[in-house]
A protein has these predicted regions:
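A polyanion-binding, active-site-adjacent surface
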Residues: 1-185
Length: 185
């Protein structure tokens, strides 16, 4: 893990490294059953080197609490792209391609039981297909045999309050899926 984190922090595989303050490898329990994957770091994450620390991070923490989870306790949080895109734009295909081996290795090391993709860019990076969140909700996908559930990114939910109820449904689906995985049902 430490070697991977160091490689991420030193990465120069795409142009995002030129503007970043800090690469953001991920944070949490390195033996977690739950992996939450976002799109990429924002301004506060770039400053602090930790994912989901701004307003969207506070919402994510609240979302975790609703299903009896806590950051760092059986939960690992990462991003599809490890450096902040300029002006918080959506990461480009080449940027995803440059970062994806890092996410792949994190998943290999972590071996989570369940992955929750937060937002369309994260879902598309993990599933390698075009995704529309509204159509993907409530369905079980897979990444290398690991179940993947798709939901809205917390930053989107901050701008689109009515969809919080849908995200709650997705989290309940994720919790029920994890219970089935743990109890073999």
């Amino acid at each position: 893990w430490d070697e991977l984190d160091a490689r991420i922090r030193e990465c120069a595989a795409c142009d995002l490294c030129k503007r970043r303050k800090r690469a953001v490898p991920g944070v949490g329990d390195r033996q977690a059953d739950w992996l939450f994957v976002g799109e990429g770091p924002g301004a506060e994450e770039d400053e602090r080197g930790e994912p989901f620390v701004g307003q969207a991070g506070r919402l994510l923490d609240a979302m975790l609490t609703t299903i009896d989870l806590r950051r760092g306790d059986d939960v690992f949080i990462g991003n599809a792209v490890k450096c902040r895109p300029p002006n918080n734009r959506t990461p480009e295909t080449a940027e995803h391609a440059a970062c994806f081996p890092y996410l792949q290795r994190q998943i290999e090391l972590l071996q989570p039981r369940l992955i929750v993709a937060l937002g369309r860019p994260a879902a598309q990076a993990l599933l390698n297909q075009e995704i529309k969140i509204a159509a993907a909700r409530g369905k079980l996908f897979a990444y290398n045999g690991i179940p993947v559930i798709v939901t809205y990114h917390p930053a989107y939910l901050l701008r689109n309050q009515p969809d919080k109820a849908k995200a709650w449904e997705d989290l309940c689906f994720a919790r029920a899926t994890m219970r089935r995985l743990k109890h073999g049902a």
